[in-house]
Amino acid sequence: VEITELPINIPPRTSPEVYFTESNSGIAVLLQDRDASWLGIAHGLKSIGVPFRIVESIELALEHDVILVYPTITGSNTAPETLSALANHVRGGKSLIAFSVIGGGLPLLLGFESTEERRDLLELNFDSGIFDGNFFQDPAETSIRLSALENPAPMPGVSYHTLKNPPIATYDNGSAAITQNSYTVGDRTGYAYAVGFDFGHFILRVQNDRFAGLADTYVNDYQPKIDTLLRFLAKVHRDGSPDAVQFLTTPFNQEFTALITHDIDFTRSIENVPTYAALEASQDIPATYFLQTKYVTDYNDSLFFTQDSQATLQSLHDQGMEIASHSVAHSNEFKNMELGTGTETYPSYQPFVFNFETVRKASIAGELRVSKFLLDSLTAQTTVSFRPGHLSLPYELPEMLLATGYKYSSSMTANSTLTHLPFRMNYSRNYDTELDIFEIPITIEDERGRLGDRIDESIALANKIANHGGVVNVLIHTDVLDHKLEFERRFIAEFKERAWFGTVAQFGHWWAVRDSAVVKVETVNTQTKRVLITTDGAIDGLSIRVPKDWTYEEGLEGSQQQDDVLVLGPFEDIAQVLFSLPASN
């Protein structure tokens, strides 16, 4: 068994150059300060599917139709020629979204006259009627809490005053948080926005679980707060660029992604696995089984991971199910365990749970590497997904997952992370260094009220998430059948034709390849656009939203257009498609 090299040395900060490409399609993020929380902006734009590159020169930024300036604009941090170029950019019919604008000669351009720096921000509220169409479809999408209800710690920011147009969003005291202005030049309209609240810092703080108390509920509810911020940025991109292309968030342009996941962490749970798997196999639904490799009898339960488990695991594998790790000890103290040595092996690794608060002879490395070794040894698979018992979350989990060979985590709830989309994780859940680990948060679980009594509210929740193409990750323990099995049967029947169902690993792989995608839009002639997409690996069902008057012509076998969405056929590394435009273009 290989020794795990523990990630005890802090890696270097992720460089903005990681997000620089030669493509000038999408948004230019003009970075003013490398020490800012720009990684939150980058991860957010990746999640929502908006193409972008990070630049540090105004010359490169001006190659784009839409420029996002982050984290601040002041008279002292922005050169006069840059300020002038940004103003001319907007007055020429292109778009600008600027964060924390304090002076610099741009207030009137952005639609306000004065600013106020604040440290008392408690809430951000979007005007639900400010955008046409169905941008806001639920009250939960319009209000974002910026401070916990208990022990509030208000956030800093900027408010804008004496506005030219109604604000897009306001703070709890009624002052403007996001302003808007526009300039029409010929057939082009340039839009200018000032944002007084740091999206990047908020995203990183919440998704790294360092901002507790913001959500109304822990799980089983609709909390799309980060998603609203990201959809706003996507709208700015779409409105500001005539060639806007966006990567959609679900495979094959389905309404949402549905993941059926099971936690097997109780003696009787493994006995019920074949019944759940039979239901899923009969519906051609692959599910993920997070299995505790419990080979020690302790306070929690008797051991149940034995040689007899192999037949069950092999049957799951043969039916197309994913087998994932749910740790060895299933201890709530996982979050407080030592890293370990990286040499932990079965059977000498013997973690013992004394009670809910106490576990001995356990380590994070042991929980990860020993459970993975056992699952890999008993099946013909490589275990790549992990979920901790009790969703106990060590700060070091992301880098320890990477060190022990995992790729995907399902360790947090969608409500606690304020998003119904996957996201990339950072080293030690901090703000500076990204890792190749993706979190797919849990949406619905079965411990807070009888699951069988919650099918209607769960369907309603899934429909809300479907409005914007999110992920519904359902956690069902297999400790009983009856109402839980019936819940799953009804959930699958309700959404089988509308959602894309897959395993955590299947969706995680699709999402990771999508995350690597870079798009370049080229003008072939007055009536033809070429879209070139490159990825790190093979992908099927990647979907792109294009301008409504584009018609797919040719380029990739198996591609199908559905209104303004092109579902791309399977490809590896590179795809090229051509669109025709109306003669008037």
Task: Describe each PLM feature range.
Residues 402-431, 439-449, 501-511:
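His/Asp/Glu-enriched short active-site or ligand-binding loop at hydrolase and phosphoryl-transfer sites
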Residues 40, 125-205:
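Catalytic beta-strand/loop cores that center a nucleophilic Ser/Cys/Thr
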Residues 105, 109-110, 257, 270, ...:
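Metal-dependent polysaccharide deacetylase catalytic core of the NodB/CE4 family, i.e.
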Residues 507-548:
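Surface beta-strand/loop "capping" patches
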Residues 2-66, 222, 228, 280-281, ...:
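Aromatic-Pro/Gly-enriched surface loop or interdomain linker
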Residues 3-22, 43, 187-191, 196-256, ...:
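Extracellular ligand-binding/catalytic regions of CAZymes and related secreted enzymes
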Residues 262-264, 437-507:
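Catalytic grooves of carbohydrate-active enzymes
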Residues 76-145:
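A glycine-rich, often tryptophan-bearing local segment used as a flexible ligand/cofactor-contacting loop or short
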